[in-house]
UniProtKB/Swiss-Prot annotation:
It comes from Culex quinquefasciatus. Pfam families: CSN8_PSD8_EIF3K (PF10075). Component of the eukaryotic translation initiation factor 3 (eIF-3) complex, which is involved in protein synthesis of a specialized repertoire of mRNAs and, together with other initiation factors, stimulates binding of mRNA and methionyl-tRNAi to the 40S ribosome. The eIF-3 complex specifically targets and initiates translation of a subset of mRNAs involved in cell proliferation. GO terms for cellular component: eukaryotic 43S preinitiation complex; eukaryotic 48S preinitiation complex; eukaryotic translation initiation factor 3 complex. Residues 46-207 form the PCI domain. Disulfide bonds: none annotated. PROSITE patterns: PCI (PS50250). Belongs to the eIF-3 subunit K family. Keywords: Cytoplasm, Initiation factor, Protein biosynthesis. Component of the eukaryotic translation initiation factor 3 (eIF-3) complex. GO terms for biological process: formation of cytoplasmic translation initiation complex; regulation of translational initiation. This is Eukaryotic translation initiation factor 3 subunit K.
Amino acid sequence: MDHYVKMEDGKVMPIQEMLKSIERYNPEHLKVIEAYVEDQAKDNKYDLEANLACLKLYQFNPQMMNLDVTYTILLKSLTNFPHTDFVLCKCLLLPAQMNDDSVKEIVYLADILEKCDFTLFWSRVQKNPQFFKKITGFSESIRKFVCHVVGITFQSIEKQYLVRLLGDVDDKVLNAWVKKNGWKEEGEYILVAQQEGNIKTKHITEKIDFENLGPLMANCL
C-alpha cells in the first residue's frame, strides 16, 4: 500500500520522497509513518529509513511515543540480520522504551541472535508466539539468517541438529530450506557447500614510485 503525506502548502508527497527532505522531522507526519511501519509488518516489506525516522520523531516528541509501533520496528530489524539495523534502532530508543519489559525481551533476542544461539532463540519465541504473529514472515526471515550462518560454518551438519536450529521444523519445511540453499541430504546428514568454494583470494597490489626505487637500485650497485 502506497503512503503519502500532505504538506502545509497542500501538496501531496510520497513518503519515500518526504523521508529524503527536512519534512522527515515534522511531527505532523508521524501518524502516516506509523501506519507505514504497521503495513511493513503486514505486507512483509521493510524500510529501515522510515523506521529510523519514526524512532527519531519519538526522540524529539516523547509524548507521542507509541510502544506497539516500537515493538514492530525492533522486530522488523531482527528479520534483517546479520545487518546491523537493530543496533541503529536501539541507539534511538528513549529510556521509557528501554525500560519496557517487551523491549527488554526483544533486546535479549537480538543478543541471542548475535551469538547464534538459535535453539534458545526459538524457545523464547515459543513462549509468546502471539507477540510475533503480527510480523508476517518473521520466522522465515530468521531461518534465512540461520541458513546463512550454517552455510559459512559447516561442511556437513546432522539433520536433527539443523531441524533444531531452524526451530523444530517438520520434514517439509526442512526439505524446502535444504533445496533453497542447494544443500544435499545424505543419510542422517545434510551436506553443505564446500567451504573452499567460499574462500576468496585476496590480491594485494603495492605501488612503488620510480623516485623511491632509484636510491634502492643505487645501493645495490
